[in-house]
Design a protein with these regions (language model features):
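Compact, glycine-rich, soluble single-domain proteins
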Residues: 1-130
Length: 130
């Protein structure tokens, strides 16, 4: 699975990958883990000492609600991205041990610090099968 950003959102037709598309496609991460169980969602990136550059941890939810991200026991800075209906709502750099942020989302993505620098609110961010 990979995480892909489309710089020109088109909510009616979804992401377009053909050569005629006006949307610019950017692969953000090629190594994506899904946090599907309660245990994996609770643990998140806690206790990890490093993250590969092409890595993302994605949390998918059935409905868009306010979701928290804490950095307790997270030893590396990360970029967090909150997404509703494939549209980026917010991107934040979070510091180890100190940060706590919340935002409404149905997809939450945690990336290595700097990996979210080109992701902007309003762009589309989708999980695609490899």
């Amino acid at each position: 699975m990979r995480l892909v950003q489309y710089s020109t959102p088109d909510s009616e037709t979804g992401p377009q990958t053909d050569g005629d598309s006006a949307a610019q496609r950017d692969v953000v991460a090629t190594n994506v883990d899904l946090a599907e169980s309660i245990l994996s969602q609770t643990r998140g990136l806690m206790f990890r000492r490093s993250l590969p550059d092409d890595y993302a941890l994605a949390f998918r939810f059935d409905t868009a609600k306010t979701r928290d991200v804490h950095m307790l026991f997270v030893f590396v800075p990360i970029d967090a991205v909150w997404v509703v209906d494939d549209v980026v709502q917010r991107v934040e750099r979070l510091r180890p041990w100190r940060s706590f942020e919340r935002e409404r989302c149905d997809l939450l993505v945690e990336l290595p610090a700097g990996a979210g620098a080109a992701i902007e609110p309003g762009n589309r961010l989708v999980l695609e099968s490899s």
